[in-house]
Amino acid sequence: MSKFWSPVVRALEPYVPGEQPQIDGLIKLNTNESPYPPSPKVLELMTHDAIDRLRLYPDPDSKKLKATIASYHNISPEQVFVGNGSDEVLGLLFMAFFQQGKAVLFPDITYSFYPVYCKLFNIDYRTVPLNDNFDIDFNDYPQDNSGIIFPNPNAPTAIGKPLAEIEALLQRNSETVVVVDEAYIDFGGQTAIALIGKYPNLLVVQTLSKSRALAGMRVGFAAGHKDLIAGLDRVKNSFNSYPLDRLAEAAAVVAFEDDSYFKRCCNKVIATRDYTVRELEKLGYQVLPSQANFVFAAPPAGNAAEIAQYLRDHKILVRYFNKPRINQFLRITIGTDEQMQKMIEVLQQY
């Protein structure tokens, strides 16, 4: 701690990401990355000409990527905002929309970056407990708020919400912004982007880190009414006028264009997830219903921390959260068939 730190910095409890260890032969199932490489067309971008152009600043408006995303989702480019990963997009929207004098609402068990943003930007917040089934119950969300944000599917529980329930929430909360954080939507959920033309207070955030395998490029975006997007642009341009580097933007464009590769990879992850759920349940694990590229599973003896260490000793890394209500669960990213078979074999020997 430095004497030069501001009171805000002194009070912060930064987000702690999953480990990125450099261990030979490690099966890494702890940060929900794709087990498959990006589209082969991404590699084709890495030409001498592309590298040479890195000496030039990128397009500050990311017009080509916005147009690509808009075309993919049948919306207008002015309804799209892009940023350096969805975490940056989320941070900017907290600043843009949630400093309204009332509490912003989000689940008590959810993405742990949300309270970090609130403390950083001095935003009042209130967490709403998940129900006994670890599901979000929108009936528990009061209308007196400065905004609502939740992941769909939720993280780390992996449980998704149907569009009908999201639309009902929007109808009850027409005076504040509702943010649907769709980092894992491509593994079985239905995106709410189709609703942005109907609800001017809806903002949908997605990332290319999971289903499109570009975690190392840091690309995220938001879709919403053009006035919400304009607000995000105002905040972004007060920090950094160049949101994406040239290679990241080009890679993101082709990741959307190669739709057949994207769908094949998603389908493989879903099939492997179904296999993993079946095998874990055979071992007596409680596995919450998943619409994500991971499962949230509780071992029968309730010894999740011990199992996490046991797997680590066998060079298999999963995520354990030492937090109330979920400290008997493991979050397990879906890897390749071979990786998940290996994990099951190791668990069978426990």
From Swiss-Prot:
UniProt keyword Ribosomal protein, yes or no: no
Keyword terms of this UniProt record: Amino-acid biosynthesis, Aminotransferase, Histidine biosynthesis, Pyridoxal phosphate, Transferase
SUPFAM superfamilies reported for this sequence: PLP-dependent transferases (SSF53383)
Keyword Transferase: yes
Listed pathway(s): Amino-acid biosynthesis; L-histidine biosynthesis; L-histidine from 5-phospho-alpha-D-ribose 1-diphosphate: step 7/9
GO biological process, one term: L-histidine biosynthetic process
GO molecular function: histidinol-phosphate transaminase activity; pyridoxal phosphate binding
Domain of life where this protein originates: Bacteria
Pfam families: Aminotran_1_2
Modified residues (N6-(pyridoxal phosphate)lysine): 210
Cofactor annotation: pyridoxal 5'-phosphate
Entry EC no(s): 2.6.1.9
Reaction(s) the record says it catalyses: L-histidinol phosphate + 2-oxoglutarate = 3-(imidazol-4-yl)-2-oxopropyl phosphate + L-glutamate
InterPro entries per record: Aminotrans_II_pyridoxalP_BS, Aminotransferase_I/II_large, HisP_aminotrans, HistidinolP_aminotransfase, PyrdxlP-dep_Trfase, PyrdxlP-dep_Trfase_major, PyrdxlP-dep_Trfase_small
Assembly mode: Homodimer.
Family the UniProt entry places it in: Belongs to the class-II pyridoxal-phosphate-dependent aminotransferase family. Histidinol-phosphate aminotransferase subfamily.
HAMAP family tied to this protein: HisC_aminotrans_2
Protein name per UniProt: Histidinol-phosphate aminotransferase
Phylogenetic classification of the source organism: Bacteria, Pseudomonadati, Pseudomonadota, Gammaproteobacteria, Cellvibrionales
This protein's encoding gene: hisC
